[in-house]
Amino acid sequence: MADSKPLRTLDGDPVAVEALLRDVFGIVVDEAIRKGTNASEKVCEWKEPEELKQLLDLELQSQGESRERILERCRAVIHYSVKTGHPRFFNQLFSGLDPHALAGRIITESLNTSQYTYEIAPVFVLMEEEVLKKLRALVGWNTGDGVFCPGGSISNMYAINLARFQRYPDCKQRGLRALPPLALFTSKECHYSITKGAAFLGLGTDSVRVVKADERGKMIPEDLERQISLAEAEGSVPFLVSATSGTTVLGAFDPLDAIADVCQRHGLWLHVDAAWGGSVLLSRTHRHLLDGIQRADSVAWNPHKLLAAGLQCSALLLRDTSNLLKRCHGSQASYLFQQDKFYNVALDTGDKVVQCGRRVDCLKLWLMWKAQGGQGLEWRIDQAFALTRYLVEEIKKREGFELVMEPEFVNVCFWFVPPSLRGKKESPDYSQRLSQVAPVLKERMVKKGTMMIGYQPHGTRANFFRMVVANPILVQADIDFLLGELERLGQDL
């Protein structure tokens, strides 16, 4: 039968290719979308690694398989994967499945182009420029530059590299030999990519000076001043401050205006890592959390997080208008960036980045924005804040739940205190025993498949849960389920 032929025979057979893809898309709609976003279905189907290897039959063979077997494999891959679009997936800073963004991702994959020249990606070169222009306008810049990067970590690393190049342009050719000992500054609550970036760029992790944060996780500008003076006294040259708008755990927003004042006094590049909190700029009600961001030199913003644009969608935005990106990263590869092309070669943006091939990440955001409009996206942000407030009030009502602190963003950090520990906060082993609760409950919920929520210690604080209210399809019933499920899972502890 034709259906039993190995998949390789589909080459050159458009009818068979179309039939296969229709079946695959049917599986995607049924399993990943319909079931994957249904609260009555499991978030995950947990299996131990060895069992999962056996179930998936991962080993690659010399012979191709039948169409039916390939479809079974597609179904299995989805079945055993975590459903991040599920309304009870609270584990990461991204969640949800926007249908228009997904449509954009499907088109992107189908066209399979690279965003480096206008000749092979004309639609997306123009589209990226327009999307970046809109994002910059929300930051508060009428002009500037930018690029989509493969994740917020890379955006942060770009900012470090650009700040270094601006101060010491000879480093592009001469490398570290052209540099004195450099110092960059960031809060102890920053994303770990800042330290990784310093190591990756050859500055070394010792070049990262950690600035104190207050009890809410916000950088203390006075300590930033102190750290700058200390670095200078030790013979280092300060060149960059990385502030955070929306820290990973507590959801804190650094005081950008005060930090910008410090940077202005010392002539330092100000980068704002708004990968998590940048989308708040869309909300007229809450954008005050990022007051002062327009004074930054660069901003990292991940629409794949709170806007649910889908992985990956990460923008690096620059206030610079001097073509700094291209001057820093360009290498003028003659087989790509010929200067005698028949169109305006300024549209060939590929020399701005350190990559050659670059994925198209603008379409999903553009299509979602076209469908929702700025007003629809603003509602999405405001709704997340409203549900956060609902969760906070419910936590305060329920026995056995305790807030770590009042949130200012959509990160809600709290403890579940099981029956055996209630009223025993003064016991010497209370914190140690409380720290054991979250890992046990996490294992139980994952193996049961009912929900996923992250936990972590923080400083001297015992392990606590970090609830992220980000999925646009969340409703109050999902919040109620979260709290009720923790009570059910922890009633015997």
UniProtKB/Swiss-Prot annotation:
N6-(pyridoxal phosphate)lysine PTM sites in chain numbering: 305
Organism superkingdom: Eukaryota
GO terms under biological process: L-cysteine catabolic process to hypotaurine; L-cysteine catabolic process to taurine; taurine biosynthetic process
Alphabetized UniProt keyword annotations: Decarboxylase, Lyase, Pyridoxal phosphate
Biological or metabolic pathway of the protein: Organosulfur biosynthesis; taurine biosynthesis; hypotaurine from L-cysteine: step 2/2
EC number(s) on file: 4.1.1.29, 4.1.1.11
Entry keyword annotation includes Membrane: no
GO molecular function, one term: pyridoxal phosphate binding
PROSITE patterns: DDC_GAD_HDC_YDC (PS00392)
A Pfam family: Pyridoxal_deC
GO cellular component: cytoplasm; cytosol
Catalytic activity: L-aspartate + H(+) = beta-alanine + CO2; 3-sulfino-L-alanine + H(+) = hypotaurine + CO2; L-cysteate + H(+) = taurine + CO2
Protein family (similarity comment): Belongs to the group II decarboxylase family.
Function: Catalyzes the decarboxylation of L-aspartate, 3-sulfino-L-alanine (cysteine sulfinic acid), and L-cysteate to beta-alanine, hypotaurine and taurine, respectively. The preferred substrate is 3-sulfino-L-alanine. Does not exhibit any decarboxylation activity toward glutamate.
Subunit structure: Homodimer.
PANTHER family hit by this protein: CYSTEINE SULFINIC ACID DECARBOXYLASE, GLUTAMATE DECARBOXYLASE-RELATED
Name of this protein: Cysteine sulfinic acid decarboxylase
Species annotation: Rattus norvegicus (Rat)
